[in-house]
Design a protein with these regions (language model features):
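A short helix-loop-beta-strand connector motif used in the catalytic cores of GNAT acetyltransferases and
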Residues: 39-52, 61, 73, 221-232
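Conserved beta-strand in the GNAT
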Residues: 52, 58-68, 79, 230-235
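Acyl-donor-binding surface of acyltransferase catalytic domains
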Residues: 91-187
């Protein structure tokens, strides 16, 4: 098994791994264009922190990390984006080999922490467990029911938080009467909820920027100014 840096010519094999090993880990299926957009040709993609395992000319493993001083805690953190292994070589040893290469690349850039969180700008879609293919907007970490989770703990990673999928089937939803009563009480106190109206409601860019979340910075103002229906609280 040969460990080496990822090359652009590896993209078709990475796509195969994504839609096999990645699908088994819970990632949403992607075509080549979407995988490029979200990962392999994303502006935050770091070729020097992306590695493959090769056996007799075939890719058996892939791991990607990214760094950047403008990222959240980017002065000290490197972000592990994904680790994929073909089922024929999905072992703790190969996981350690790939992760070790990514971590070494972080150290070479002066980083002291390897993290797997939603602050990673490479936001990879995954299927919410128990749903009929519904996607969460970004892979928040490592699913607890796959081998990679226990392997990373054994390698010294620690669980900092558990994210629960945000999903509700609204087919039979009915607005509760109690919420109508609460809305009336809040309105009497000068607090209301409305749809965001461009040119009427102001300060969304400044409000989001003050929260210091790069994902929200990129998505929420653009959605508001682009006409997406967003709820806003007003006082």
């Amino acid at each position: 098994m040969k460990l080496r840096l990822y090359e652009r010519a590896d993209a078709p094999e990475v796509l195969r791994l994504w839609n096999t090993a990645g699908a088994a880990a819970g990632y949403a299926p992607l075509d080549a264009g979407k995988l490029d957009e979200l990962l392999l040709a994303h502006p935050a993609f770091c070729g020097e922190s992306t590695f493959v395992l090769e056996e007799k000319g075939a890719l058996r493993g892939f791991a990607a990390g990214c760094t950047g001083d403008t990222l959240a805690q980017g002065a000290v953190r490197g972000y592990v984006s994904c680790v994929l292994l073909d089922e024929t070589c999905d072992t703790a040893e190969n996981t350690a080999l790939l992760l070790g290469a990514v971590e070494d690349s972080f150290r070479a850039k002066g980083k002291s922490v390897a993290a797997v969180t939603f602050f990673n700008p490479l936001r990879l879609p995954w299927i919410i467990p128990g749903t009929d293919g519904h996607r969460h907007n970004n892979m928040p970490g490592i699913a607890k029911d796959i081998p990679l989770y226990e392997r990373m703990l054994a390698l010294g990673y620690r669980e900092a938080a558990t994210e629960m999928a945000m999903y509700l089937d609204l087919a039979a939803f009915a607005y509760p009467a109690a919420m109508e009563e609460r809305a009336a009480k809040m309105a009497a106190q000068g607090y209301t909820v409305d749809w965001y109206k461009e040119g009427v409601h102001r300060g969304v860019d400044e409000m989001v920027a003050s929260l210091g979340n790069s994902m929200w910075d990129a998505e929420i103002p653009a959605a508001a100014h682009g006409g997406m229906r967003l709820l806003v609280g007003l006082s």
